[in-house]
């Protein structure tokens, strides 16, 4: 399950959003070391491939808070609307979502996709996208709630309606 046998997704977490914001905002458009936003190196131990990941942050008023991972360049882009926008938990959620896509790539799990090529409805139903959104939803639950709640109770598309590419 997930982290090469580690099981509990809570093993890898990010620094609090304000700390990430203080580090990332002055570096928009520049490569950011993923270590600088992780609480500890548990993720890097489980997935040494992340050491080579290039993380970029950018402003994009049209896109708002969004992100994407490009396996061809091993780059991850995290976008937030405007320099004055408050990060709160937005960047943390985008990082979780996009990191899950990289884990899917490494583990050869069901992958996500691009709504521009698949259409919004099919994209929303892709098993990799459902999993990545569910990782975010579960991350913000307490550890006790996460243990009590099945993944099927927090995912936004039932298993039988998901598309696996």
Model region roles, listed by residue range:
Residues 102-107, 139-143:
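A generic secondary-structure signal for well-formed alpha-helical elements
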Residues 30, 34, 86, 122, ...:
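Charge-dense, low-complexity intrinsically disordered segments
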Residues 89, 105-129:
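Post-HEXXH active-site segment of zinc metalloproteases
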Residues 49-92, 99-106:
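Active-site scaffold of zinc-dependent metalloenzymes
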Residues 95-99, 127-129:
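Alpha-helical architecture
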Residues 28, 109, 143-147:
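Surface-exposed helix-capping loop/turn segments at secondary-structure junctions
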Residues 120-165:
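Active-site or metal-binding loop neighborhoods of secreted/extracellular toxin and effector enzymes
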Residues 1-66, 72-73:
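A metal-dependent hydrolase signature that marks the N-terminal structural subdomain at the beginning
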């Amino acid at each position: 399950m997930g982290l090469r046998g580690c099981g509990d997704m809570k093993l890898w977490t990010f620094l609090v959003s304000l700390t990430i914001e203080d580090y990332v905002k002055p570096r928009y458009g520049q490569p950011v070391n993923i270590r600088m936003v992780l609480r500890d190196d548990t993720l890097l131990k489980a997935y040494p491939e992340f050491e080579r990941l290039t993380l970029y942050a950018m402003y994009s008023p049209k896109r708002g808070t969004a992100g994407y991972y490009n396996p061809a360049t091993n780059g991850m882009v995290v976008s937030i609307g405007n320099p004055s926008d408050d990060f709160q938990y937005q960047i943390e959620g985008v990082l979780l979502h996009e990191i899950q896509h990289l884990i899917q790539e490494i583990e050869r799990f069901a992958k996500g996709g691009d709504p521009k090529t698949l259409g919004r409805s099919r994209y929303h139903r892709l098993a990799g996208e459902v999993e990545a959104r569910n990782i975010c939803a579960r991350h913000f639950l307490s550890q006790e709630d996460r243990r009590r709640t099945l993944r099927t109770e927090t995912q936004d598309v039932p298993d039988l309606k998901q598309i696996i590419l």
